[in-house]
């Protein structure tokens, strides 16, 4: 049933993923501005990945040829994989915190004060803030749930792209 839906409406799937990303970003803003949780550098990178997936899937859901929605879908798939990687790294830091947990620089401080070649490794090394678990739902931290969401989006995109109808080769029709 789900695979039939994926076959019939790839643009609907892309629109649904875009809406889910926007909902997750809105929930992140709620946690930050209403609940008072400050995002760590890895959380901010995950937000950027969500924004990218939302934009690419949103563009893919608009009218256009098959090639366009497939292009946007592939880009969204790559960003979903990147977001899953960052969320997995943050989950690892939460499960196995570093010996010395310090509150490192904030994300924007790292980007502004260090060359990008030094800032990127610092972000992925994490800080004491990245290992902290400030909120849980059903036993999972925000990073755990973010990982699950990124993996589900990546799997849905992958299935959608793999099941996309292929154009006939060589000019022969199957009929």
From Swiss-Prot:
Acyltransferase in keyword set? no
**What GO MF terms are annotated?**
electron transfer activity; protein-disulfide reductase activity
Pfam families documented for this protein: DsbB
Q: Tell me the residue ranges located in the Periplasmic compartment per UniProt.
A: 31-48, 89-144
**GO terms for CC?**
plasma membrane
What GO terms describe the biological role, i.e. biological process, of this protein?
protein folding
Q: Where in the cell is it found?
A: Cell inner membrane
| Record topology, Cytoplasmic segments | 1-13, 66-70, 164-175
Q: How does it sit in the membrane?
A: Multi-pass membrane protein
- Where would you find the membrane-spanning parts of this chain? 14-30, 49-65, 71-88, 145-163
Q: Which Cys residues form disulphide pairs? A: 40-43, 103-130
Question: What keywords sit in the KW lines?
Answer: Cell inner membrane, Cell membrane, Chaperone, Disulfide bond, Electron transport, Membrane, Oxidoreductase, Redox-active center, Transmembrane, Transmembrane helix, Transport
Which superkingdom does the taxonomy of this entry point to? Bacteria
User: What is the role of this chain?
Assistant: Required for disulfide bond formation in some periplasmic proteins. Acts by oxidizing the DsbA protein.
Q: Which PANTHER family match?
A: DISULFIDE BOND FORMATION PROTEIN B
The entry sums up its family as follows: Belongs to the DsbB family.
Report the protein name in the record.
Disulfide bond formation protein B
Species name: Paracidovorax citrulli (strain AAC00-1) (Acidovorax citrulli)
Gene encoding the protein: dsbB
């Amino acid at each position: 049933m789900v695979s039939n839906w994926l076959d019939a409406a790839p643009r609907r799937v892309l629109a649904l993923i875009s809406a889910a990303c926007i909902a997750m970003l809105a929930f992140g803003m709620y946690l930050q501005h209403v609940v008072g949780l400050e995002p760590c550098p890895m959380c901010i990178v995950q937000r950027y990945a969500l924004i990218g997936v939302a934009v690419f899937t949103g563009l893919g859901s608009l009218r256009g040829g098959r090639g366009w929605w497939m292009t946007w879908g592939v880009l969204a798939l790559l960003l979903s994989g990147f977001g899953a990687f960052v969320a997995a790294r943050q989950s690892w830091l939460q499960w196995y915190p570093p010996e010395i947990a310090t509150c490192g620089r904030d994300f924007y401080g790292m980007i502004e004060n260090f060359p990008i070649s030094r800032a990127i490794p610092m972000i992925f090394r994490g800080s004491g803030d990245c290992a902290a678990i400030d909120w849980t739902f059903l036993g999972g931290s925000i990073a755990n749930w973010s990982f699950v969401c990124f993996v589900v989006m990546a799997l849905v995109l992958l299935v959608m792209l793999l099941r996309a109808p292929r154009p006939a080769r060589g000019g022969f029709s199957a009929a």
